[in-house]
A protein has these predicted regions:
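C-terminal effector/interaction modules appended to NTPase cores
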Residues: 2-176
C-alpha cells in the first residue's frame, strides 16, 4: 500500500525511519515512487507515493516526519498575521484555521501587538484587527497542529484564517 503526498521539507530515502503524526507510529520507508517511476530519494516540493515497511493507518492530513527531525506539535500557536477582511476581527469568533492539508477551529487567544508599518514599532494594548493590520497573535486550536516556524519551513510554517460563516479568507499568518 502506498501513501501519496507532497514533500514539504527535507529528504526522504528508502530505509529512512519515519514517524506518523499525530499517531506517533514509526516505520521505515520501503520505496519511493513518482509518475516517472521509482526514485532513490524525494525532496521538496515533489509529489510522491511512499510505500512503508509496516501496514499502519495513515489518514488525510497526517504528517510523515523523519524520526530525528520532529516538528512542533501544539494547540497554542504564535503567528504574525495580516488581516485581509474589511470586517474587523471579533475575538469571540471561532475561526477556521487551514494549515497544510488540515482544517480545524481556533480562537484568537491573545493579540500580542500590532506593527506600525511606517515605523515598524510594536503597538501594544490593541485588541482587534482591521483591514491591512499586521501583528502578532496567539491562536488556540481545537486539535494540535504539526508545524515548524515559517523561518524554518514556509509550507508547514504558514496558515490562513477563514471566516466560518462566509468562508472568506480573513488573514494569512506566518508561525513564529
Amino acid at each position: 500500500r502506498g501513501y501519496a503526498g507532497r514533500v514539504a521539507g527535507g529528504v526522504f530515502k528508502p530505509g529512512d525511519e519515519v514517524t506518523v503524526l499525530p499517531s506517533g507510529f514509526s516505520t521505515r520507508v520501503k520505496a519511493i515512487h513518482s509518475p516517472d517511476g521509482e526514485l532513490s530519494e524525494a525532496f521538496a516540493p515533489q509529489s510522491v507515493c511512499l510505500t512503508l515497511t509496516d501496514e499502519i493507518d495513515i489518514s488525510r492530513g497526517d504528517t510523515l516526519v523523519k524520526a530525528n527531525n520532529p516538528p512542533m506539535v501544539n494547540q497554542n500557536i504564535e503567528a504574525m498575521i495580516c488581516w485581509f477582511s474589511p470586517r474587523p476581527m471579533l475575538r469571540s469568533t471561532k475561526w477556521i484555521v487551514r494549515h497544510t492539508m488540515r482544517e480545524t477551529q481556533a480562537i484568537i487567544k491573545e493579540v500580542k501587538y500590532h506593527v506600525d508599518i511606517n515605523t515598524l514599532h510594536k503597538i501594544e494594548g490593541v485588541d482587534d484587527f482591521h483591514m491591512n493590520d499586521i501583528g502578532r497573535i496567539t491562536l488556540r486550536t481545537a486539535v494540535p497542529l504539526i508545524y515548524d516556524s515559517y523561518r524554518r519551513n514556509r509550507t508547514t510554517g504558514s496558515l490562513i484564517l477563514i471566516d466560518p460563516h462566509t468562508h472568506e479568507t480573513v488573514a494569512a499568518g506566518m508561525i513564529v
